[in-house]
Amino acid sequence: MKIMKQCRHMLVIWLTLTLPSFAQNVDSLAGKKIVFLGDSITQGGGYVTFTAYYLAKLYPQKNFDIYGLGLSSETLSGLSEEGHAGGKFPRPCLFERLGRLLEKVKPDVVFACYGINDGIYKLLDAERFAAFRNGVTKLIEQCKAAGVKEILLITPPIFDASSKAGVFNYDSVLTEYAAWEMMLKVSGMHVIDLHTAMRKARDARTEVFSKDRVHPGEEGHLLMAKTILTAFGVSVPFGTPATIKADPLYQQVDLLRRHRSSHWMNHIGYTRGNTVAPQPLGDTEMEAAKIQEKIDAIRHPK
């Protein structure tokens, strides 16, 4: 009975992940400079690495130039709840650094996953919702003005709490934010509906994706990556986080993501309580090229 139940759960997840939300393919990513923007979930980088890993593994003849540039606590709305970070500092807003990021990195493609911090964990409110919508619009406008060719909005992940009658569940706010994003129609911009995919997958299992309700664990990050890849028509083979992370290719891809993230974040500069002024990039890309050579050696064995 337990096996049958697990099979039904896997079927629900498979059905969720095999329906692309727009007509795209990996050729729109190959050979492009790709930036992932977001909050602590993106800065943690799990789903960014899983995405980069599968692209590298499944398409060894194509190159994908990926930069994970998320910042913990960040919003698009510019809002912050009282006592954030123990009252030490308000939430950072992307627009403090976005101009520098676009100028320095010059991305062709931008993925952006925001929303979970933007409602500041309170009831749905017209002003807060408007601030989020304005932030999304501003992000799209600034990216397009900087020459970004493709913008991919990723609807927010779920707030991983069980709904109880008469008790406020913050996920209801994120559901509204995601629904609004899904209605957007802008040239050069597409939306990947992570929220619905994650909600369906979570409802089909008993274990949480996020122990603290906000930050997904490895299984949640893998689901995020699969949702993104499926939107590009990628057929992702089954694998657990443990088996994937044991792959030497994954380890080098993760090393490259971490290396670039830390050095490029400092090169761009940011404010999160303290201000990190922009620093020289130095030999960051020379070292990145060495890691890429190891990745290519694994992808193209002699």
What are these regions (language model features)?
Residues 23-83, 87-88, 98-106, 110, ...:
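Serine-esterase "nucleophile elbow" of acetyl-processing enzymes
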